[in-house]
Amino acid sequence: MNVSIEIGLLVSAFLIFCSILMSKTGYRFGIPTLLMFLLAGMLFGTDGLGIQFDDVSVAQHIGMVALCIILFTGGMDTKMEDIRPVLSPGVMLATSGVFLTTLFCGLFVYWVSGWQLHTGVGFTLIGSLLLAATMSSTDSASVFNILRSQQINLKHNLKPMLELESGSNDPMAYLLTIILIQCLQAGGVSGWEILWSFLLQFVVGIAGGYLLGRLSVWLINRVGLKNAELYSIMVLCFIFIIYCSVYLLKGNGYLAVYIAGMVIGNSRLFKKKEIGTFLDGMTWLLQIVMFLMLGLLVNPHEMLPVMLTAVLVSVFTYTTLFRSRLYDLCGPSA
């Protein structure tokens, strides 16, 4: 079915508008905003109002663009003076915490899939770990949305530690996901190859993000553009240059853009306020588009056969893993 560009724009604008209205309702009840965007997509999807969208390739490409900007903006919002006192435990939680969550949750999924629950759900060990890796990290926007709506006050250095952990754990999850996908596609990869890929992506990602971030700061402060709005467009170009350059060097592009965002955000930058405002707006738009699109890809009737397994995994993940990480951050009150 061919749809004109005018109809496509009308439907897209209407979906985004409805998602924004739904997010207001979710905020009142302490429901994460991004979850409301996802539910909006499911409501308007195939099993809802009948909008059909099943192009996974398009979703992947849009998701890549969105994640680059979201992670870069998160890096810019991370203040080094706040996270310096909690840098060591925060990084430990963002790396080893995600790794252990992936490991134990993956083993649990593999164990549950062998229970013969008559669900037709079965995973290999690598497949189980891949599933766990995709849900091993937390989202900083969602975390603080819940904290604000529930009026939870964080004392001492817990807030910056939570910001650091939530903002920096995504690259680790992406890295694990990419490595596990490579293992599945290769049909078997040696431990040394996995270790080398892990180290290469981390080292090149961090080094590339830092160096290109410093270069971006130097160029922005010296280019001398007459139109102030062009600085925001320039930063947008730098985001994708950094991601693609590091990716082509076999590094982790998502980690690179996050590190570059931290470098740029903590440097003296011309038109910094205007750039931040522009990126905040872009981040919200892309979060809406990405989660709305993911919701459209979901067919709720296909979830029924796997619901029991999914509920068991969710309960295990919260009660034993995420809660233990929250305890490390917030203490016994968690």
Model-predicted regions and their roles:
Residues 1-334:
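Transmembrane helical cores of multi-pass secondary ion antiporters/exchangers
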